[in-house]
Amino acid sequence: MHLDSLVAPLVEQASAILDAATALFLVGHRADSAVRKKGNDFATEVDLAIERQVVAALVAATGIEVHGEEFGGPAVDSRWVWVLDPIDGTINYAAGSPLAAILLGLLHDGVPVAGLTWMPFTDPRYTAVAGGPLIKNGVPQPPLADAELANVLVGVGTFSADSRGQFPGRYRLAVLEKLSRVSSRLRMHGSTGIDLVFVADGILGGAISFGGHVWDHAAGVALVRAAGGVVTDLAGQPWTPASRSALAGPPRVHAQILEILGSIGEPEDY
């Protein structure tokens, strides 16, 4: 039996579960109850409630355990595991921005084989199974068309110029400077999952993520690949749950951005 024949019914079940979670997502917009600090990040009561609801429903319906952003779960390299971000773009969500989403990926032995991204405030619901196509609101989409970096929008992760870590702020500024010399159409949406699904949908021509959280990436990686795009880390290695960054785009744009990144030097030099 082909993998897609196993996965497609799971995606159908998961879609109904995310539809059911949408009401709670909408009610909590502009939520201001930060319940836990995680560096500069936080969760709201709505994050926790959505994760509890979706996890319980997924396990009951599919028999597959869930690794969630807020409560964790089984290892992401398990035979089968759902990976959930109940609200991607939590700061946007709490501030009242519509750029927030529910992200759900299905991993098989650590490989994203399905992705679902729900954007309740603007209506799009995206799904895909490995091999494609991308499906938007129930309608199959054409494969991604390739393009030139100079002609497309590029999503870039948000940051502080004074931040440290694996990708210091000064390195990220260097990335922006180099990219802007080729494309003046850089965008910061404050949601990795939205950046990735926008690449899959052809809204963005590329996206750079300086983060390594699997729940931010699993769904979008599946969607981009299903649409015909490429997703690697910033060094050009295929994205895996252990990756600490991501670069997504159609093949030509991906290669052009990767060449620019290679010209900047190593992050630790900054």
Swiss-Prot record:
Task: Say yes or no: keyword Thylakoid present.
Answer: no
What broad class of enzyme is this?
hydrolase
What are the binding positions for Mg(2+) 2 in this chain? Answer: D85, D88, D216
Membrane listed as a keyword: no
Q: Name one GO molecular function term.
A: metal ion binding
Classification via SUPFAM superfamilies: Carbohydrate phosphatase
Q: In which pathway does it act?
A: Polyol metabolism; myo-inositol biosynthesis; myo-inositol from D-glucose 6-phosphate: step 2/2
Question: What does the record give as the reaction this protein catalyses?
Answer: a myo-inositol phosphate + H2O = myo-inositol + phosphate
For this protein, the record's Pfam families field holds: Inositol_P (PF00459)
What EC designation does it have? 3.1.3.25
Entry similarity comment: Belongs to the inositol monophosphatase superfamily.
Q: What is known about what this protein does? A: Catalyzes the dephosphorylation of inositol 1-phosphate (I-1-P) to yield free myo-inositol, a key metabolite in mycobacteria.
Q: What is this protein called?
A: Probable inositol 1-monophosphatase ImpA
